[in-house]
Amino acid sequence: MIKNLSKPFKWFFQLEAASGLVLLIAAIIALVISNSSLSNLYFDTLNQYLFIGINDFGLKLSVHHWINDLLMAIFFFFVTLEIKREFIQGELSNLKKALLPIIGAVGGMVVPALVYVFINLGNSETLNGWAIPSATDIAFSLGILSLLGSRVPISLKVFLTALAIIDDLGAILIIAFFYSGDLSISYLSLILISYILLLTLNKFGVKKFIPYLIIGAFMWFFTYKSGIHATIAGVLLASTIPHRIKEKDFSLLIKLEHAISPYVAFIIMPIFAFANAGVSLEGLSLTSLLEPVPLGILLGLFVGKQVGVMVVSFIAVKFGVAQMPDKSSWLSLYGVSILTGVGFTMSLFVGNLAFAENIQYIDGVKIGVLAGSLLSTVFGYFILLYASKK
């Protein structure tokens, strides 16, 4: 039964096996260009401002912000659709299996933060970066996992997707409560009203996407203006899309999954990678990794993440609180735990907010995030590759 229910998820990740390579190529090209004679063109293009709206109603954002706030809201919308279906009738419909990524995400946020704090004790300025290694870059971690294709069971891909979504929601909440300026109560109220309207559409069984899309677009605008990262609007919208078990492959949720998955896999994710992987390495050196900020981030991402996710998951399974994903081993779960240390763009984003008043630490953030994410990518990939052969 699970095999039949997971067909849409398998279908998407078969696409992802190809798109993971496209994403990796896009990231490498961006990194090369941003450290070449074309770097000014690259950064100037991303920093160009575009106005989208009607008359005075709209937003004027840089190309980079449109990609990170709008396109990634669509990405979060898609992966939340996937996870919602898995909670209703798939891999996560079993409570004990559903609890594992939730518990793992908590460990994956707390332990890296503790590692960073331990290394930066005594320095009130650098302690402000405690949340940097707590984030997971969902697009890159899934992209790396997808390179392994069918050698990784669908259940582990579901586990990583669910964990990364929870992780990123945690990061968004951390940003909202610890690093944001004043949150707008009026816009937060409008978000709540929008969400209630969406739930009402779901309650009355509205199966046309247009009403959801219109309200969702306004909710995205309200979310952006509220001071909370706008990608959360994609999660909220997806959570209200109707799906009933008896509808099988004909629900609005399933139709949307199939309709937008190739665009997410081959357009949105590569564009995101190209726009965010371009980090200038000028002035960075490996010796600077020994400084408290980069060392705390490096160890938080590469050590703290895998220890946090793996240890709490192991304890939860051994005490019967949670259940292992189907067809997975402890070694393969460990490999996925390492991949959660790919913090990359989310960690860089949190780092820029954490040290907005102390920009002298930004270079340290960059090298710490790049080193920690790279180590997590390489070790996670090869551990999973080895586990697939056993």
Curated annotation (Swiss-Prot):
InterPro entries: Na/H_antiporter_dom_sf, NhaA. Pfam families: Na_H_antiport_1. Its main location: membrane. GO terms for biological process: regulation of pH. It catalyses: Na(+)(in) + 2 H(+)(out) = Na(+)(out) + 2 H(+)(in). Coiled coil: none annotated. It is found in: Cell inner membrane. Keywords: Antiport, Cell inner membrane, Cell membrane, Ion transport, Membrane, Sodium, Sodium transport, Transmembrane, Transmembrane helix, Transport. It is a multi-pass membrane protein. GO terms for cellular component: plasma membrane. The chain crosses the membrane at residues 13-33, 61-81, 99-119, 129-149, 158-178, 181-201, 209-229, 259-279, 297-317, 330-350, 367-387. GO terms for molecular function: sodium:proton antiporter activity. Disulfide bonds: none annotated. PANTHER family: NA(+)_H(+) ANTIPORTER NHAA, SODIUM ION/PROTON ANTIPORTER NHAA-RELATED. Na(+)/H(+) antiporter that extrudes sodium in exchange for external protons. Belongs to the NhaA Na(+)/H(+) (TC 2.A.33) antiporter family. This is Na(+)/H(+) antiporter NhaA.
